[in-house]
UniProtKB/Swiss-Prot annotation:
Function recorded in the entry: May be involved in the assembly, structure, or function of the flagellum. May polymerize to form a filamentous structure that is part of the flagellum.
Family, per entry: To S.typhimurium FliF.
Annotated keywords: Bacterial flagellum biogenesis
Name recorded for this polypeptide: Uncharacterized protein YvyF
InterPro entries listed in its UniProt record: Flagellar_operon_YvyF (IPR022258)
Species: Bacillus subtilis (strain 168)
GO biological process terms held by the UniProt record: bacterial-type flagellum organization
Length: 139
């Protein structure tokens, strides 16, 4: 179930869910903006447009266009000059959430953490295998 929240755009009260992050009025406004961008990009001569040109020509905010791309409502496969920023470093990318450099860095960090965990487990297991014998008799 959702929770009661204020719309981040217009501050109206609405029921926020994972899928609905703005109020109904703002959803309708976003849909109008999407239609505007979609109609612009359907024209063959506009498919070479960059993000800044689309913003300039349609009047739709860059962040909203990026939201449509992230939601995969705008497919960029046939739009060669359109890209969106990596969520970690901001480099322009055309697929996924992270650029190749960030993917590699995250993988290296995960490998390092997994290696540390393996060493910690190995150390704990070696303590379990150690037996101590105490001689209580004094010979």
């Amino acid at each position: 179930m959702g929770e009661l929240a204020n719309c981040p755009k217009c501050n109206a009260l609405f029921l926020k869910t994972k899928l609905q992050t703005v109020c109904q009025a703002c959803i309708k406004e976003e849909e109008k903006s999407f239609e505007t961008v979609y109609k612009f990009l359907r024209k063959q001569e506009n498919r070479q447009s960059t993000l800044s040109r689309i913003t300039e020509e349609t009047g739709v905010e860059e962040e909203l266009i990026l939201k449509f791309i992230r939601q995969k409502r705008i497919q960029i496969t046939h739009l060669p000059n359109l890209a969106y920023p990596c969520e970690r470093c901001g480099t322009s990318i055309r697929e996924g959430k992270f650029c190749k450099a960030c993917q590699s860095d995250i993988k290296d960090q995960m490998d390092h953490l997994n290696h540390e965990d393996a060493l910690k487990i190995e150390k704990e297991n070696s303590k379990k295998d150690t037996y101590y014998a105490y001689n209580t008799k004094n010979s």
